[in-house]
Amino acid sequence: MKIAYSIALYNLINKILFTDSEGKEVERDLPFNVKYKLQKDMDIVSKDYAKFEEKRTELIKEYGAEKDGKMTVTDENLETYKTKLIEYLDTEIDHKFYTLTEEEIGAIKDVKAECHEMELFIMYLSKTEDDI
């Protein structure tokens, strides 16, 4: 799995646990076992998200300059910054996730997920018949 996928899963799990169908922040009412597994998975991917933010900030400092009291990447360094960030996001990592059964997935309602998020959910967080 790439770090970029872990970041996308972080965003999706956050949506599932803490937003309603209109995107408002709420703690969703989910069965204990579903919430438990998703929270365990969130613990895994949140570490990747924190490292990503740390790396992104480091790269902004390296390839940026202070402008109006805020660090921003300079125009002449923008392509290098993007390349370095993409290299980092393409880094392979290995995680063992708590997967959900089809029945458990059925308890998750009204989540606005992007197609790529759903693909990652299916690949990494759902149990297939082979897993059972």
Residue spans for each PLM region:
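A composition-driven surface/loop motif
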Residues: 1-132
